[in-house]
Amino acid sequence: MTIEQARARIDSERERENSLGIQYWPVFFRDTGEFVGCAGLRPWQMDPNTIEAGVHLMRSAWGQRLGEEALRAVLAYGFDMLGLPTIVAGHGIGHDNSQKLLERVGFGYTHNIKWGPKAIEVRMYAIGAGMWRSTRTLESA
């Protein structure tokens, strides 16, 4: 990504936050402040009326439950602050840890799609506000 492309991406994220109240936010290691990725919400490319959650972390952050912490914060924002009824997410076939993450926070599998110019097979999941609230109640019990 060039500097110009990065600036354009930042501008589009700011515009999305201003118009929809959603964007991708940076993720850092709490102890060191090291940037390790991003997480957030955006309109789903297959249906812009549907909101998709995503977490994208560098390999140095894998396996430390940072993705789970970030995804839970994103879902709390979407459901508790924005009042969204449903949030979707997906992962490429073979990304078993992504599947485990989505299932751990309460997403349920819905269907597979072919995505992008290379028609990558993606497993799609969804979680509704009611399920989100019930999983949070179980965690705090």
PLM feature spans:
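Conserved GNAT-fold acetyl-CoA-binding loop/helix
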Residues: M1-S12, Q23
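Short loop/turn motifs at secondary-structure junctions and domain boundaries
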Residues: E15-G21
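Acyl-donor (CoA/ACP) binding surface of acyl/acetyltransferases
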Residues: D11, Y24-A141
